[in-house]
Amino acid sequence: MAKRQIVDAHHHLWDLDHGYAYPWLQDNPDADGMLGRLTSITKTYLPADYLADAADYQVVKSVHIEAVPSDPIKETRWLTSLGANIPTAIVGFAALDTPDVEKTLAAHAALPKVRGVRQIVNWHKNPAVTFTQSDLLADNAWQAGYALLKKYNLSFDAQLYAGQMDEMYALARRHPETLVILNHTGMPIDRDPDSLKLWRDGMQKLASADNVVAKISGLGMVEHGWTTDSIRPFVLGTIDAFGSERTMFGSNFPVDRLYGTFGALYRAFETIVADFTPVEQDRLFRANAERWYRI
């Protein structure tokens, strides 16, 4: 049987052997934090390593998402220098709340594979799971940086929690010319009934903005012991909100390698959407990532 062709909408690479620094990954990998112990992924991860993990599938193109580097332009230039088709597109890091952010945006935009930027904005009242000390979406300086994305034709990869979806919706509506790509299935970390309703309602609201699309990825980060059945409602809930035309699958490797193999993850995706039409499946696994990341 021929391998399914996929475009991975979300993965990472890093070279820890040649001076590229990722403090979140390297400083204390044995700590049992939100993501679990990082020891097994605290090593260089290059295109060949990624393709070995993805060997059950034919990865025809891929999108590299910034991995919170200490030097964002150095990371993007390194990725560009790899020269291969993996990655095909790059989403770089930009701290939108800093005074010199426009220099960063201009430097990213000058590189041919760059399509957008990401700055993780997950804010949560629980200090064990928050990624930021305050809600950046409500910060005036951050919003001013976001407003510059149109000038450089850059999309924004939005990694946030359900409690921030109303804010992201308002921002997307204020800047309809900027494409927002929701990361990691909206990160449904809280599983009590009220929180699940907040996630469902937030996904529907975000989807009502035409310039917002979604990636189904990163579910292992919020449920380390995931199963096909446990992630099913989040996969189908995302597709129900955004439709098969505005949803795409991503691996989040090697981070989600902490919680399972690439093959297990994609087989779970295939099982969950087995009743979808071939056209719908191709959108989810391949065509939508090509469309929204312009590859």
Segments (PLM) and residue ranges:
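Active-site gating/metal-coordination segments in enzymes
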Residues: 70-163, 170, 215-222
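Generic structural signal for well-ordered alpha-helices
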Residues: 47-51, 76-80, 101-106, 142-146, ...
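Divalent metal-dependent hydrolysis catalytic cores, especially in the metallo-beta-lactamase
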Residues: 29-43, 48-70, 87-95, 115-122, ...
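Mid-to-C-terminal alpha-helical segments outside catalytic/metal-binding sites
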Residues: 2-9, 18-56, 61, 237, ...
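Catalytic pocket-lining loop regions of alpha/beta-barrel enzymes
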Residues: 132-248
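Conserved, mostly hydrophobic/aromatic
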Residues: 10, 62, 90, 117, ...
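Acidic-and-aromatic substrate-binding clefts and catalytic sites of carbohydrate-active enzymes
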Residues: 41, 68-74, 94-102, 160-166, ...
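Histidine-centered catalytic micro-motifs
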Residues: 6-16, 182-185
